[in-house]
């Protein structure tokens, strides 16, 4: 398939050919869901913690004698049923990360790209380069292109001026091609690829 290439000023800059093996798949929501769940699980902190009965600061002595009081049998006041006692089966510090095969991760990226193409939400820009690091000027260019919620993917090296100018614009993300991922593609409305990014994707999946 072919897409029109535009400049940041909104002018035509030719066409680019896209591989059907990368951009022409029938999107599968289950694959996308698996990859996004894997990404978010990796990011989750897992610093939650509650003290168990072995960790609370309290005497471990038996509360009162076993027999003769007429009361229920108890040992330590650290037990979970008492105020100030330890939590039974409470949260512990752990990693929420789980494994996902590389083939599924790669397939998820291709399905995310295909989903954006199918929704007509992909724009190819010839070059993501700004002459100066001015947010106002870049925001005006984005408005001309109708980009209010978008992910920009550049080549291996991002233009410093473009990155600086874009980082303060709401709902706009800028990543190098190495950072392209399913979650960021799906969470933004439009996907904007530079010609260098398209070439890198073709090379990666050939």
Swiss-Prot record:
Ranges of compositional bias, category Basic residues: 64-77
Location of the region described as Disordered in the Swiss-Prot/TrEMBL record: 63-97
Any single GO CC term annotated in Swiss-Prot or TrEMBL for this entry: ribonucleoprotein complex
Keyword list, A-Z: Ribonucleoprotein, Ribosomal protein, RNA-binding, rRNA-binding
Any one Pfam family match given in the protein's UniProt record, by short name: Ribosomal_L4
The keyword rRNA-binding appears for this protein: yes
GO molecular function annotations of the record: rRNA binding; structural constituent of ribosome
A GO BP annotation: translation
Chain's role: One of the primary rRNA binding proteins, this protein initially binds near the 5'-end of the 23S rRNA. It is important during the early stages of 50S assembly. It makes multiple contacts with different domains of the 23S rRNA in the assembled 50S subunit and ribosome.
Subunit structure of this chain's protein: Part of the 50S ribosomal subunit.
Family indicated by similarity: Belongs to the universal ribosomal protein uL4 family.
Name under which the protein is recorded: Large ribosomal subunit protein uL4
Source organism phylogeny: Bacteria, Pseudomonadati, Pseudomonadota, Alphaproteobacteria, Hyphomicrobiales
Gene that encodes the chain: rplD
């Amino acid at each position: 398939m072919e897409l029109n290439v535009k400049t940041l000023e909104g002018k035509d800059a030719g066409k680019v050919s896209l591989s059907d093996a990368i951009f022409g798949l029938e999107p599968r929501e289950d694959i996308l869901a698996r990859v996004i769940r894997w990404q978010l699980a990796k990011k989750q902190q897992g610093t939650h913690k509650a003290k168990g009965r072995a960790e609370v600061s309290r005497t471990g002595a038996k509360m009162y004698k076993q027999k003769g009081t007429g009361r229920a049998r108890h040992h330590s006041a650290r037990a979970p049923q008492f105020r100030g006692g330890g939590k039974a089966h409470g949260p512990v510090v752990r990693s929420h990360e789980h494994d996902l095969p590389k083939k599924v991760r790669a397939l998820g990226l291709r399905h995310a790209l295909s989903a954006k193409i199918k929704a007509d939400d992909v724009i190819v820009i010839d070059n993501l380069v700004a002459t100066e690091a001015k947010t106002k000027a870049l925001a005006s260019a984005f408005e001309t292109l109708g980009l209010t919620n978008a992910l920009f993917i550049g080549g291996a090296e991002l233009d410093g001026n473009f990155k600086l100018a874009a980082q303060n614009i709401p709902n706009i993300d800028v990543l190098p091609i190495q950072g392209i991922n399913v979650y960021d593609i799906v969470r933004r409305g439009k996907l904007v690829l530079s010609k260098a990014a398209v070439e890198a994707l073709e090379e990666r999946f050939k």
